[in-house]
Regions:
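Glycine-rich, mobile lid/loop segments that gate access to catalytic sites or pores
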Residues: 7-16
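Short acidic active-site motifs
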Residues: 7, 128-131, 153-154
């Protein structure tokens, strides 16, 4: 167990010097993610984070030099990272693959890039733009770039994505380091039901109920009926004693 895993446990249970916390958030390697998953329930967590991933949609107007660079920016994270591109143009696909081979030669994490691109990467060619939308919503990627002539037309069509980057001058590393939105994002398809970390992640709600006597009496028969159907007679009795009193 590495120091970071121990830190997760220390925060969840508390120590003589560290007070117990209610929620643990933030990215980490597979060991940190596993520690957070094991401790979910003891504390709340932001999400179950897996390896980094990117889906790029590119039409015939995209620049293969940029596309290759952006795919590798995620592939370099680790050997389990996923970098997938879908394009409407066979020419763009071929040129992007050539650029990956050219650019990776001078990158420091070439071995990791080569492994992740070979095992978890893909370049898909489809003339059907709707297929790209369908694929995106099924994969629910952590990051997605739309590099197309009119990228904003895809807003509202792609629902399941952690962070959406629009246009050739909005590369994924912009979101990692500078743009502003939190880049702790759902991975492994969990963008179907998880959202990026945000201020609302640190807010919890409670319910408040206050009935008058008349309001409770109006609802009493309905509550008693439901409780008795469930054979929870003490529930029903809690209402009956007030109705009778």
């Amino acid at each position: 167990m590495c120091i970071r895993d121990r830190a997760v446990a220390a925060l969840a249970y508390g120590t003589e010097e560290i007070p117990r916390v209610s929620k643990i958030v933030g990215p980490g390697n597979i060991f940190v993610a596993t520690a957070k998953k094991l401790l979910y329930g003891t504390v709340d967590i932001d999400m179950f984070a897996g390896p980094s991933e990117i889906l790029v949609f590119a039409d015939e107007t995209a620049n293969p030099v940029y596309l290759a660079a952006d795919l590798m920016s995620q592939a370099e994270h680790d050997k389990l990272a996923s970098a997938i591109m879908i394009t409407t143009s066979m020419d763009i696909a071929v040129r992007t693959q050539a650029e990956i081979e050219r650019q990776s030669a001078y990158l420091s994490r070439k071995d990791i890039i080569d492994y992740s691109m070979t095992n978890y990467g893909a370049i898909i060619v489809s003339e059907d733009k709707d297929y790209a939308i369908e694929l995106a919503n099924k994969l629910a990627p952590e990051h997605m770039e739309v590099v197309a002539e009119n990228p904003t037309e895809y807003i509202g069509k792609i629902d399941n994505v952690g962070s959406l980057f629009l246009g050739q001058y909005s590369p994924e590393p912009l979101g990692d380091y500078y743009a502003g939105p939190n880049h702790v994002l759902p991975t492994s398809g969990t963008a179907r039901f998880f959202s990026p970390l945000g201020v609302d992640s640190f807010v919890k709600r409670s319910s408040y109920i206050c009935y008058t006597k008349d309001a409770l009496l109006d609802a009493a028969d309905d509550i008693i009926l439901i409780a008795e159907r469930e054979k929870l007679t003490a529930h029903a009795n809690s209402i009956k004693v007030r109705k009778e009193g």
